[in-house]
């Protein structure tokens, strides 16, 4: 039956609550991380089958890499190369400018169309807006027709349609078919399959612990385990249980805790259910050969996960 997966405690700085692929940025949760070291120009890294509005339009490097794969596959599937990224990463000052311009246009005291400065997902570098651009003419992107391929498949690349019409009451943002958010795999697939927006998903994850992990079968059959650890706000850092012999990442939720995502190295067999909860007794046994395949130096993992 193999050996038990051993968990060990590592200390994670509480400032990391505000960083990672799964952070929630909305009216209630300001973006405070302000680490722009991973922000890169999309233009410098993009593939040939989409456009970008300017050389300064930027995203986090992981989000650009995923975007490149997605839009290359979209081109292969549908033979369209007219998507243009019109907005990515914004500084707080740029967001303030957009906000002020909207108020000037509407004459209102608050905006329903532009997020408050400090509260826009764009400031995190994980979000982008797209339009269509052909023969010098830009037109609105609505995600219909051939372009529905993107909503149907974006989870394969770690992206979600962030502001769906049926979630407006929860997100506080009206439908934006052009706004995509990178959350990473396997989270995008789980959210899509269970029709959850990011707010709902992060709330649900609080039900899972290192003893009672959420098992997610990714779109490609790879099995992940996900759980939540509340931040110890009385201290500067929080002890988080992680499996040192497996690949894992740690993301803050931007409010009060950490989400640990473990790549078990296992692939779903056909008779297994698509999603299941894993308890400590059933889930902590991993075949020895699987452990060997996914083993990595704990020090490397620990640094990578929280850096």
Report each predicted region and the residues it spans.
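Extracytoplasmic cell-surface/polysaccharide-interacting catalytic and binding patches
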Residues: 1-88, 92-307
């Amino acid at each position: 039956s193999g050996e038990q997966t051993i968990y060990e405690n590592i200390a994670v700085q509480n400032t990391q609550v505000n960083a990672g692929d799964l952070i929630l940025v909305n009216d209630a949760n300001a973006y405070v991380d302000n680490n722009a070291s991973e922000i890169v120009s999309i233009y410098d890294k993009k593939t040939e089958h989409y456009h970008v509005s300017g050389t300064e339009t930027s995203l986090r490097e992981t989000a650009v890499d995923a975007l490149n794969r997605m839009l290359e596959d979209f081109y292969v599937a549908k033979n369209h190369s007219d998507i243009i990224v019109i907005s990515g990463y914004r500084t707080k000052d740029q967001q303030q400018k957009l906000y002020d311009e909207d108020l000037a246009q509407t004459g209102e005291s608050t905006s329903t169309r532009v997020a408050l400065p400090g509260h826009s997902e764009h400031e995190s570098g994980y979000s982008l807006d797209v339009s269509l651009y052909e023969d010098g003419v830009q037109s609105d992107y609505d995600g219909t027709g051939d372009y529905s391929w993107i909503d149907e498949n974006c989870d394969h690349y770690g992206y979600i349609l962030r502001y769906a019409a049926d979630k407006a009451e929860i997100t506080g943002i009206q439908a934006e078919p052009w706004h995509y958010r990178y959350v990473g795999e396997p989270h995008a697939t789980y959210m899509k399959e269970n029709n959850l927006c990011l707010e709902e998903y992060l709330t649900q994850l609080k039900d899972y612990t290192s003893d009672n992990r959420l098992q997610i079968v990714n779109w490609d059959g790879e099995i992940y385990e996900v759980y939540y650890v509340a931040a110890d706000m009385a201290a500067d850092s929080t002890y988080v249980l992680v499996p040192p012999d497996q690949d894992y990442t740690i993301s803050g939720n931007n409010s009060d805790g950490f989400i640990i995502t473990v790549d078990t190295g296992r692939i779903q067999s056909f008779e297994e259910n698509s999603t299941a909860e894993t308890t400590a007794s059933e889930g902590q046994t991993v075949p020895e050969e699987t452990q060997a395949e996914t083993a990595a130096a704990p020090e490397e993992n620990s640094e990578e996960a929280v850096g």
